[in-house]
């Protein structure tokens, strides 16, 4: 019984303390949110993604009838083709073709290749602070990759089903998320100070 009374008293005291410092709580929360918004909007460099889709086939004659076994085999080949696309054989050629002032390792970090929902479709994504640069590099990758893959694997092919996109909105920073996170940190900080 005493424990219950103590808990009620403690909760009442906490709520009373919060009410006494309500203006401070609101001010700090809003100030923290403003800091988060300002940092995201003006201090962080926006990053843009450009993506293209390619479909993997186990045979070079893409017009022939395709069996379910061939589709399964093509799905398994996606990981192999992903490694080839990110290899220096492809990316160095992209660097040379576009005259990029980047090393292979630097470009490799900006490129991701992944299967789309465990299908035979690959998504190639290039990230940059310039949406046009990202699109150009992504477009060059899907231009160079098919011939390199065909030569390396000797059986099978890849076909572009969606060309490189031009981003209109950055993928990061997430201004709304960062603002809310900063506000939450400010709120919790003040609550902690009040309670302690």
Annotate each predicted stretch with a short phrase.
Residues 1-196:
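Hydrophobic and amphipathic membrane-targeting/association helices
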């Amino acid at each position: 019984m005493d424990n219950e009374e103590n808990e009620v008293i403690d909760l009442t005291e906490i709520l009373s303390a919060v009410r006494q410092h309500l203006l401070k709580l609101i001010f700090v929360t809003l100030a923290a949110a403003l800091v988060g918004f300002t940092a995201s909007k003006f201090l962080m460099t926006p990053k843009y993604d450009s993506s293209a889709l390619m479909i993997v086939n186990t045979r070079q004659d893409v017009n022939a009838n395709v069996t379910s076994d061939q589709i399964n085999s093509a799905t398994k080949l996606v990981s192999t083709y992903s490694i080839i696309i990110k290899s220096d054989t492809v990316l160095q050629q992209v660097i040379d073709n576009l005259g990029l002032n980047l090393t292979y390792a630097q470009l490799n970090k900006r490129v991701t290749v992944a299967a789309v929902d465990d299908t035979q479709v690959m998504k190639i994504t290039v990230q940059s602070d310039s949406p046009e640069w990202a699109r150009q590099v992504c477009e060059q990758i899907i231009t160079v990759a098919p011939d390199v893959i065909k030569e390396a694997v000797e059986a099978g092919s890849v076909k572009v089903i969606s060309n490189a996109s031009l981003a209109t909105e950055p993928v990061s920073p997430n201004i709304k998320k960062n603002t809310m996170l900063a506000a939450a940190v400010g709120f919790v900080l003040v609550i902690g100070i009040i309670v302690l």
